[in-house]
UniProtKB/Swiss-Prot annotation:
One of its GO terms (cellular component) is plasma membrane. One of its GO terms (molecular function) is NADH:ubiquinone reductase (non-electrogenic) activity. Disulfide bonds: none annotated. It is an enzyme of class 7 (translocase). Keywords: Cell inner membrane, Cell membrane, Membrane, NAD, Quinone, Translocase, Transport, Ubiquinone. Gene3D superfamilies: NADH:ubiquinone oxidoreductase, 30kDa subunit (3.30.460.80). Its main location: membrane. It comes from the Bacteria. NDH-1 is composed of 14 different subunits. Subunits NuoB, C, D, E, F, and G constitute the peripheral sector of the complex. This is NADH-quinone oxidoreductase subunit C.
C-alpha cells in the first residue's frame, strides 16, 4: 500500500505542482501539504481525475497551534471508493486569513465548514451560509482554540422561576486547583497517629 500511495502522491504532484508543498506517508496514510489559495482547484482535480476519483469528502477539521504565525492547520479527509484509497490535505493558515470554501465541489462541505468556523473561528469565503452550527447564536469565542477558557465565558441554564433559559457570567464556587501528580505524598507509607493496624 505505501508504494501505491507514493505513486498517487507523485501523480498529484506532477499534475498539480503549484498546489502541493510536499507530501508524506505515515501509518499507511498519505498527507499532502497544500498551498491555501489552491485548495478548490486541487479538490476539483482529486475528484475528477481518473487516477484519483476522490468523490467522498469524509471530514474537515482544524488543529490550533497558537505558537506558530500560521496558527491553524485546516485538514480535509477524502475517500476514493473506486481506488480504495484515502487522502488527507493539510494547509496552514494565519488567524486573519480566510479559506476558500469547497462547497461548490463537495456540497457536503457545508456543515463541515460551519463546524470549523464555529469551533475555531476560521472564515470560509464563498460559503452559502457560514453561521454557527454547534454553539448558541450569542456564543462568545471559539471553544476548540487552545486559548479558550475551559469554563467558557457564560453559563447557560434553565431557570425554574422564570421558566426560560438564562445566560449568566460564570461563577466558580471553588477556584481551580492545580494537582501535583508527582507529589512525594503519593504512594508513601506514612503511619498516622492512632493507626494501630499499620504498625502490625
Amino acid at each position: 500500500m505505501p508504494e501505491a500511495l507514493q505513486e498517487l502522491a507523485a501523480h498529484v504532484q506532477m499534475r498539480q505542482p503549484d498546489a502541493i508543498l510536499g507530501h508524506r506517508v505515515e501509518f499507511g496514510e498519505l498527507t499532502l501539504d497544500v498551498v491555501p489559495n489552491r485548495i478548490v482547484g486541487l479538490v476539483e482535480f482529486l475528484r475528477s481525475d481518473a487516477s484519483c476519483r476522490f468523490s467522498s469528502l469524509v471530514d474537515i477539521t482544524a488543529i490550533d497551534h497558537p505558537e506558530r504565525p500560521a496558527r491553524f492547520d485546516v485538514v480535509y479527509h477524502f475517500l476514493s471508493m473506486y481506488q480504495n484509497q484515502r487522502i488527507r490535505l493539510k494547509m496552514q493558515v494565519r488567524e486573519d486569513e480566510t479559506v476558500a470554501s469547497i462547497h461548490s465541489v463537495h456540497p457536503s462541505a457545508n456543515w463541515f465548514e460551519r463546524e470549523v468556523f464555529d469551533m475555531f473561528g476560521i472564515l470560509f469565503t464563498g460559503h452559502p451560509d457560514l453561521r454557527r452550527i454547534l454553539t448558541d447564536y450569542g456564543f462568545r469565542g471559539h471553544p476548540m482554540r487552545k486559548d479558550f477558557p475551559t469554563t467558557g465565558y457564560t453559563e447557560v441554564r434553565y431557570d425554574e422561576v422564570q421558566k426560560r433559559v438564562v445566560y449568566e457570567p460564570v461563577k466558580l464556587v471553588q477556584e481551580y486547583r492545580q494537582f501535583d501528580f508527582l507529589s512525594p505524598w503519593e504512594g508513601a507509607d506514612y503511619i498516622l497517629p492512632g493507626d494501630d493496624k499499620a504498625r502490625t
